[in-house]
Amino acid sequence: FGSPENEENMGEFVECVQGIGEAAEYLKFPVVSGNVSFYNQTKDEGIKPTPSIGGVGLIKDYKKMITMDFKEVDNIVLVIGKTEGHIDQSLFARNILDEKNGPPPEINLFNEKNNGETLLKLIDAGYIKSAHDVSIGGIITAVSKMCIKGNKGINLKKPKYLINEIEYFFAEDQGRYVIEVNKDSLKKVTDILNKNAVHYDELGIINKDQMFINEKTKVTIDELRTSNTSWLTNYMSK
């Protein structure tokens, strides 16, 4: 944060801490430590608020732990949680559109908790083969990481309720997860999602080695991996 002697900066600090506290209490998330620092500014302009917190989670049975790498060709990939297409404050908006204004994604603590707890039920039942959260970079980034890690591709599709492909694949709406299930488990998985009032989209089908984004756009897993491992070198050489 900037200087706490500035009323606006102090207000940001108070609201951030209160917001984190409200969310942690609702989600029953155990925060064990945290840190902020003040007077981070150039002249009279403070940096963006960046509080840090540390939490603890418990895996009851490590044998049921799920990794993010895609496992098997022809398995089905779903997105848990609804994509509204929120682009403001996203990585895409900042880096591609060069837009830094606009509100962040809406926070819905009920959906956040419900979606997460339902995913845990699916994992505990043994239906999930791989899973990854959707955060910075949106669905396309989460799926790319799963492809690279599992050395598998995917035939992507977007739902009919969102016309804009950019918004669907790059939006950073909260409370979403990408999951992999096999065809035999699909009906059981969707029944549990429906029973718990969790929105989901069928995102695609896993293939051997390419990400098909649409009829005109595809990328190989080797190309994805090269982009992922060489970005820092390319950035530093500019």
Q: What name fits each language-model region?
A:
Residues 1-4, 9, 21, 25-27, ...:
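Mobile "lid/hinge" segments at catalytic clefts and subdomain interfaces of large enzymes
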Residues 9-23, 27, 32, 36-52, ...:
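Glycine-/charge-enriched secondary-structure boundary and capping motifs
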